[in-house]
């Protein structure tokens, strides 16, 4: 661990070649490890813990008052809390863990749905602390974690709002279109 108090690993996919779903997960974790955590580590900012492949010192556990992370995405909750506390999570590309990924679309959908619910929980519980840490303490890591967490939430909420708005517009314009249709039919019948 080179003296680091918290270290995350390279998360690899055990069943990468099973099908397109497992390969997709493998590519997702390559992106997360090599294109997010490696540059974060290079810049000496905090990385994100993902899954079970991480370690932390007893000092960290004592400082946070024991393991108090029980949301659906406890790894992200742990990351957000440490970032708010100004703790750095390092990345070790040589520490490789192998995860078995879902092989069916339904399994993947269930897991992704759980992750989205977990993101919402983390934003609700830790989002304010991340914003405060970013603005008051000037922590880039807090901004980084917000940008990795909030977009999923924002996109979900925005798509919900757009769907409701389009439904309302559809209901209003459909009535107008029906009035135009019946007026045209009536005028055609009279003439």
Role assignments for model-derived ranges:
Residues 78-79, 108:
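Short, hydrophobic alpha-helical packing/hinge segments within bilobed ligand-binding/sensory domains
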Residues 2-72, 113, 120, 124:
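Long helical/loop segments within the catalytic core of UDP-sugar-dependent glycosyltransferases
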Residues 43-44, 103-191:
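Basic/Trp-rich segment in TM-proximal cytosolic loops or flexible interdomain/linker regions
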Residues 51, 91-92, 98-110:
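Catalytic cores of eukaryotic secretory-pathway lumenal/extracellular enzymes that build
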Residues 70, 79-98:
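Catalytic donor-sugar/metal-binding loop of nucleotide-sugar-dependent glycosyltransferases
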Residues 58-59, 76, 95:
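Structural detector for helix-capping/boundary residues
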Residues 18, 43, 80, 101-102:
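Short Asp/Glu-rich motifs
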Residues 9-10, 92, 100, 148:
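Generic beta-strand/beta-sheet core signal
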């Amino acid at each position: 661990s080179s003296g680091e108090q918290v270290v995350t690993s390279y998360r690899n996919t055990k069943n990468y070649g099973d099908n397109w779903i497992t390969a997709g997960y493998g590519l997702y974790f390559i992106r997360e490890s090599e294109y997010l955590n490696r540059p974060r580590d290079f810049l000496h900012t905090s990385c994100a813990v993902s899954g079970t492949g991480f370690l932390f010192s007893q000092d960290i556990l004592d400082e946070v008052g024991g393991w108090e992370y029980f949301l659906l995405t406890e790894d992200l909750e742990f990351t957000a809390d440490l970032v708010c506390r100004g703790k750095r999570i390092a990345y070790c590309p040589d520490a490789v863990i192998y995860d078995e990924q879902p092989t069916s679309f339904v399994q993947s959908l269930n897991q992704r749905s759980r992750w989205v619910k977990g993101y919402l929980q983390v934003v609700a519980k830790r989002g304010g602390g991340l914003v405060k840490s970013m603005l008051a303490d000037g922590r880039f890591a807090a901004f980084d974690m917000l940008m990795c967490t909030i977009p999923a939430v924002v996109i979900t909420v925005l798509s919900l709002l757009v769907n409701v708005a389009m439904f309302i517009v559809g209901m209003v314009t459909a009535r107008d279109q029906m009035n135009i249709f019946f007026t045209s039919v009536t005028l055609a019948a009279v003439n």
